Amino acid sequence: MIFTKIDGNIKEREDLSHVHIETAMVKSDDLAKSILRVKSDHHNEYGIRLEEGKLENGSFFFIDDHNVLVLNVIPEKMIVITPKDMDDCGIIAHMLGNMHKPVKIKCGKISLLYDSVVAKNLEKSDIDFKVEEIQLEESLRYVDLS
């Protein structure tokens, strides 16, 4: 079966108690794709070829009137940086930009997938960071300056 349209997000729907849920585990990078093949926890394979919309953690697709496929993002090891001030933020942004790393910026924190080279550069530059397991809601993006 190939899905061409997202039917919703499981976090925004409360009326799915009457359906059986199959779950497919995906990497956060997969959320940026419009064409994807997944295998559910019931060992069923499904294709996704989106005509519009974007995948998110919790995106679901009706298989039929009684069954739903839900995408669940695998938690990933990530570097989380909390800049101390604007100068620190500028230095960090410059460093990560030079490394061409996609990031997530939210609530004053910069998050990116764990990379030992990045970690070593942050340590060398005396920049504090934490390594955490995080389940992303959407794929990381490169900063769009257009």
Where are these regions (language model features)?
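Short, exposed beta-strand/loop patches in secreted or surface proteins that constitute
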Residues: 38, 71, 102-104
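Conserved, well-structured core segments that form or line functional sites
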Residues: 87-129
